[in-house]
Amino acid sequence: MSIVFNNFSFKYWALENPTLKNINLTINKGEKIALIGPSGCGKSTLGQCLNGLIPHAIKGDCSGELYINSKNTRTLDLDHCTSMVGTVLQDTDGQFVGLSVGEDIAFALENQMIPQQQMREIVQATADMVDLNSILDHSPFELSGGQKQRVSMAGVMVDDVDILLFDEPLASLDPKTGKAAIEIIDNLHKDSNKTVIIIEHRLEDVLHRPIDRIIMMERGEIIADMTPDDLLASPLLQQHGIREPLYISAIKAAGCTITAEDKPAYFSTINLDKFKPQIEDWFHQVKQPQLDPVQDVLLSVNNLSYSYDGVRKTLDDVSFDIHKGEFVAIMGKNGSGKSTITRLIMGVLEADDGIITLNGNDLTNQSIFERSQHIGVVMQNPNHMISHHMIFDEVASGLRNRGMDEAQIKIKVEKTLKLCGLGRYHHWPVDALSFGQKKRVTIATMLVLEPKLLILDEPTAGQDYHHYTAMMAFIQELNQKLGLTIVIISHDMHLVLEYTQRAIVIADNRLLTDDKVNHIFSQPALLDQANLTVTSLYSLAQAMGIEHIDQFIRCFIAHEVKNK
């Protein structure tokens, strides 16, 4: 056996209640496990118990027993734990210690005083396993998200650990790169027979390759330990607010009942013939949704080009319009130039060529401050935006910069906080809030300035499905009830499908397409160019022999929105 928890509990010293409660779990050598559950359920805490961070670096009270490779972890120091369990973190940048990829992989070997020649051979062999040999002399900080992930994997594999722990490895990756990461993890598992544990919100992406068991947690306890087929046939995912695979949701939307015998865990194994008549009937009976009429242009981007180094173009001749009241997505792979567009719109960067207009007014000579009177930007990580200790002061800061009277500020801030679901927190310190609540604070900071356009960079990154749904419902309400024009930058294809009608896709630093989402998502070759992937919704429609796949996608999304 690799891992055994016996009545194991853990409580952080700073918290009143335990984060892990009476965990009883056995993971056998060579198993591949997915660990899922809502944010704060104890997934990462359980992982930190495995790699020794708890209790050696993170203090708290433990009870019960944890055995790794038949050794009681109470008797082991941190070095011993990390020699058995290798961890790949969600934030790969925080894991790098070398100036080059080769140095980073070799770090653990240097600490063990391995001879130089032997070290080179081990680094070379490890780099081969994750396809890094061509970039061993590159800085890890200059790599793409997928390459960084592989460097982190190599850094823990070089130690020849028995257990590989991946903590949300897909959180920052575009769909195609995420699938490649899951394939690499699967190959490592098959080639080495190591025990693999994947902590992740994106269950459908994890199930891109076979999993032995899925462990589901809630409020510090294990509430399910099942095979993927058994779990997906059960109502547990829906009951506990965890997003199920799209094809499962679509089959259920047609009124079908799924059992474990239908092999639902993987699209390649599910018995689709059984469901085909009902799915076809549902599609032909459902009413086609009507699209909203297009309003006047609010933001116009014309022939925009930019280069960070004056040589290689980050954006090349990009043009698009955003209409008043629209909810639009900008999509593309990591490093395609999506975030650069935001910086150019806000004036943080100056375009090499091209013009940006807002309500017909050229923004070229407007300062960042002037642009911020009409355009709000919410960054992916709220901690990178928040600069005040108290919530009220944070939301009031923009109004104070404008010189507004304090009495007016109080009225506006309290109204905005109430709108954002933060009314009772206005005297709270920011540090007391959850990640999702902090995100709402950053949105409130923009909304109080009454912008015409709100741009959100990866608004749901790192959030579980419950908080994801709450955040997007709030953003959708701003769009529908206030008429606020919203642009989201995202590579979450489920999010874009469900909440936006139009997407602007950037690939190889150019505009690849600007079209309705259901049209884009029914074109595999186009998606592949942008490092995106077809959804299982497309695969289902194709397998059913449905001719108008874009209409099928549109009908399903309308059904999902109606039943939310």
Task: Identify the function of each model-found stretch.
Residues 59-71, 354-362:
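Conserved ABC transporter NBD signature motif
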Residues 139-143, 147, 429-433:
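Conserved ABC ATPase signature
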Residues 51, 346:
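Helix-to-loop junction immediately C-terminal to a conserved catalytic motif
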Residues 164-167, 454-457:
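Catalytic Walker B motif of ABC-type/P-loop ATPase nucleotide-binding domains
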Residues 117-135, 407-425:
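Conserved ABC ATPase "signature" region
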Residues 221-247, 510-537:
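Conserved beta-strand-loop-alpha-helix hinge in the C-terminal portion
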Residues 160, 450:
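Conserved catalytic motifs of ABC-family nucleotide-binding domains
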